[in-house]
Amino acid sequence: MKKRVIIHVDMDAFFAAVEQRDNPELKGKPVIVGGVPGERGVVAAASYEARKFGVRSAMSLWEAARLCPHGIFIPGNHKKYQEVSEKIFRIFREYTPLVEPVSLDEAYLDVTGSQKLFGPGAEIGKKIKKRIFEETELTASVGVAPNKFLAKLASEVNKPDGFCEVREDNVLDFLAPLPVEMLWGVGEKMKERLNDMGIKTVQDFWELPEFFLRKKFGVLGQNLYYLSRGIDFREVIPERVPKSLGKEITLQKDSSDVDYLLGKLLGLTMAVGRGLRREGFYAGGISVKIRLSSFITYTRHSRFFEPTWMDDVLYREAKRLFLENYHGELPVRLVGVTATPLVPVGGGRQISLFGEDLRRENLYPIIDRLNHKYGNKTVTRAKILKISGRG
């Protein structure tokens, strides 16, 4: 099984932090979002200044006012929080399409297949954290680990504004000293039962066999056996996985010039290739769309034996489909290229590439980074130019 790299991002006191950002007079003060004292509501978020008084999310507003009588209570503005959240999630999706939202201010990201393009998981986590602060003026706590459970724990240990990476070789060292209540499923009552048994830290679980924990606590006991050892098989489940990625262009003037049309097809194919690599997908196949001046439209599709993101492979097949289906009967008005179905990088593809093919595949993310830094078309593979008839 391929080793996964999961990032958990949790914004720090999100709603309250947005209010403090937008109103400098609130900075450094105990801000409580959710309503005003006397209402029958609950706390939606509390700034860290308010948390020092014991105020927590989901607490009644009445209790929050009792604990923090000098707190600044704000009804909140969900529309504003939603807009900020959308900006943050757009940042996430620039690094991977595998984003599982937990709430407006929290998400899991599977960046296993994004490392060729953006570097190791820890580097991606730091980039995301930096981008969030630069673009929203808000802090986030980020955890990077081999699975969702460990990534969430990692994001919690250094809050607020924290960063923590748990590597496969230090999972047990990371878990050992943590109190048992850090494990999912351990509430106050369960904590008391475990403490009565002498189990106070995660390491204490390691002395107990699985059958004993299952007999004592049922399915929860079995879960605790695995979690205490850092084992979690759950996958990051995106809100939605796109089925295709495409580009099309309506020509400024209808044309029957095949060389000109193939040039446009090449540009579209390279743009689709960049999009695949940026979004973390391979193309399982490719479709070419040809709309004639009469508005008659042809769409032809071909499947790849091996899903790919390589521009030369994409273009060779797109060119074949175009030439087999356009015979110059009428000028072309529109041409388009679509990669479909999409295969997420890191899953769903049987790797059979080796030698030169694998080196070629790994070369494209490097070309993308150079072109991103110095401008598109700064670097283009000679093979692309040869296929297009331009080299």
UniProtKB/Swiss-Prot annotation:
It is found in: Cytoplasm. The active site is at E106. GO terms for molecular function: damaged DNA binding; DNA-directed DNA polymerase activity; magnesium ion binding. It catalyses: DNA(n) + a 2'-deoxyribonucleoside 5'-triphosphate = DNA(n+1) + diphosphate. Mg(2+) binds at D10, D105. The record marks F15 as: Substrate discrimination. Keywords: Cytoplasm, DNA damage, DNA repair, DNA replication, DNA-binding, DNA-directed DNA polymerase, Magnesium, Metal-binding, Mutator protein, Nucleotidyltransferase, Transferase. GO terms for cellular component: cytosol. Poorly processive, error-prone DNA polymerase involved in untargeted mutagenesis. Copies undamaged DNA at stalled replication forks, which arise in vivo from mismatched or misaligned primer ends. These misaligned primers can be extended by PolIV. Exhibits no 3'-5' exonuclease (proofreading) activity. May be involved in translesional synthesis, in conjunction with the beta clamp from PolIII. Belongs to the DNA polymerase type-Y family. This is DNA polymerase IV. It comes from Carboxydothermus hydrogenoformans (strain ATCC BAA-161 / DSM 6008 / Z-2901). The lineage of its organism: Bacteria, Bacillati, Bacillota, Clostridia, Thermoanaerobacterales.
